[in-house]
Amino acid sequence: MVPMDRLLQIVRRFEFLEARLSAGAAPAEIAALSREYAELKPVVVEISAYRTALEDLAEAEAMLSDPEMRALAEDEIPALRARIPGMEQALRLALLPKDAADARPAILEIRPGTGGEEAALFAGDLLRMYQRYAEGQGWRFELLDLAPSELGGIREATARVEGEGAFARLKYESGVHRVQRVPETEAQGRIHTSAATVAVLPEAEEVDLEIPAADIRIDTMRSSGAGGQHVNTTDSAVRITHLPTGIIVTSSEKSQHRNREIAMQVLRARLYDLERQRLADARSADRKAQVGSGDRSERIRTYNFPQGRMTDHRINLTLYALPQIMAGDLSEVISALTAHDQAARLAEMEA
């Protein structure tokens, strides 16, 4: 049973926000009030449906004492009682604390791991997979930085994904992705294992954290062409080092000014994510064990091409739909990860 007094508090807060917005809140307050209003609206819809179901059940049970209405009540009561547990579960999920970063754009970083050129090719496959998934969701996918490898893979890629639920959905992708397949360069037909690392960070704004100029060192470098060929090189590439943490970010687009913007954007995202991780660890000693903790060293998934199989090791989910997944159809696996994370957080909240 969900505590009714807590539900009434939420409804009263929602009504207060609605009245403030209707009356014309101060311009400085409108954004914060509108954001809270939008977050509470789906919760209030669930509360309204739940309260209506409880009232309908109470009315039907009262009809049992009326001989003329008893038969009708006996028909309605089982269905009403059967609906309520599902509505309570939906309410519990709606009442879970929201991750403030879920509504933000996502910064996606992909790097090859062990496996040489095959790992670089797989990293490129992952980049295309996420781009197709983003396009299928109607999100904007912007490639911020790309360092290609000699055979058409990538040495490093950074992208920005913007759209409703972008970070909320993509945050489960952080970790080590392992691939098992026969490389195109393998003459003997042997299966090789290689890996790529994915990091998904919530985009941070300048107001989220201040980075003193004394804390960073900016270096300009000569940027190289595709495949490492130093053709048409310029001094536009930028490397920014955050001295307190040792974090280094680079950008090698054609415009040096744009490179500084991109590098600072990625640096802010990494520092913001670092602080989020610190706070999450402080809140819960078990957080590292939960899906979505963002541990970049955790092997989260295996893509087995000969078997057409993808296995997510965090939730023991295996899908024999690898071609569709690599083509960007990630909805089933991400939905399963979301449900698992919600269940873990519910258990933690109710413990």
Swiss-Prot record:
Matching PROSITE patterns, A to Z?
RF_PROK_I
Post-translational modification N5-methylglutamine, affected residues: Q229
Q: Which UniProt keywords apply?
A: Cytoplasm, Methylation, Protein biosynthesis
Which one Pfam family would you cite for this protein?
A: PCRF
Q: Where found, per UniProt? A: Cytoplasm
Question: A Gene Ontology MF term for this entry?
Answer: translation release factor activity, codon specific
Major localization class: cytoplasm
CC per GO annotation: cytoplasm
User: Which InterPro entries does this UniProt record tie to the protein?
Assistant: PCRF, Pep_chain_release_fac_I, Pep_chain_release_fac_I_sf, Prokaryotic/Mito_RF, RF-1
* PTM characteristics: Methylated by PrmC. Methylation increases the termination efficiency of RF1.
This chain's function reads: Peptide chain release factor 1 directs the termination of translation in response to the peptide chain termination codons UAG and UAA.
Which family does the UniProt entry place this protein in?
A: Belongs to the prokaryotic/mitochondrial release factor family.
Q: Which HAMAP family match?
A: Rel_fac_1 (MF_00093)
Q: What is the official name of this protein in its record?
A: Peptide chain release factor 1
Lineage, top ranks: Bacteria, Pseudomonadati, Pseudomonadota, Alphaproteobacteria, Rhodobacterales
